[in-house]
Amino acid sequence: MADIMDIKSILYTEKSLGLQEKGVLVVQTAQNVTKNQLKEVFKTYFGFEPLKINSLKQEGKVKRFRGKLGQRKSFKKFYVKVPEGASIAALGA
């Protein structure tokens, strides 16, 4: 069972702000969270069931730091279709 703490943040980018107007929330989570676990988190903590959930893994970019190769952290993000009238004030959206 996933916990509310597995949701790291809501992503605020130009694309995600445009999607928010259409009722889609973009959430960054731990890499081991599944769609069904995220659905249970929304049911338990926010009181509604998402209409649709899409997921993707974002691999960390390989970057140079002081002449050596390093890699940014990889993460998983979900596009969550929220029903009309549902509120998720606990996450700040």
UniProtKB/Swiss-Prot annotation:
It comes from Helicobacter pylori (strain G27). Pfam families: Ribosomal_L23. This is Large ribosomal subunit protein uL23. One of its GO terms (cellular component) is ribosome. GO terms for molecular function: rRNA binding; structural constituent of ribosome. SUPFAM superfamilies: Ribosomal proteins S24e, L23 and L15e. Keywords: Ribonucleoprotein, Ribosomal protein, RNA-binding, rRNA-binding. GO terms for biological process: translation. Belongs to the universal ribosomal protein uL23 family.
